[in-house]
Amino acid sequence: GRSIMKTKIIKTLLIQTLLAVIVGFLVSIVANLFIEGARYFLSFQTASSALSVRFVDVDINLIPTVAMLISAFLIVLVRRSLGVTKWSGPADSIYALHQQKVGVDVRLGLGSTLAAFISASGGASVGQYGPLVHFGSTLSTMLSRLLGLQINRDVLLACGVAAAISAGFNAPIA
């Protein structure tokens, strides 16, 4: 009796710890790709004046406008191809915590994170950490479903949130 209970508790803690490490590792990679990728694409807007127009003694760079139009097209493409009916974010992660179903809608989470990346890369004033926090909980949901794990929902949300925040601020551990 008691020995079996201890073994079950230890097994559960090990699984939760392993999931936390995996999520932390993957979210840190995605967070850095998100931030550096957006910076990379934004650098093209200021580095080039190929679409510069002179109007009333003022040079107007049209690259930011073109970048936003391309971003808008790509976001519509993401929305249609993934069937996203509404964008999701950290509030949806918190809401999912209070529901019977474990985790967030993976399709909406991935679509929302991709749309936020496209928006930030195109120059929109989109926060970086909100989408990354939601991606962390989306990834936690994906892994727990893929592995068939029944883990505590508080741990599920905390793994994603802590991983995204620590990675976003280049902290080694949350």
Tell me what each language-model feature is.
Residues G1-A174:
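Alpha-helical transmembrane segments and immediately membrane-proximal extracytoplasmic
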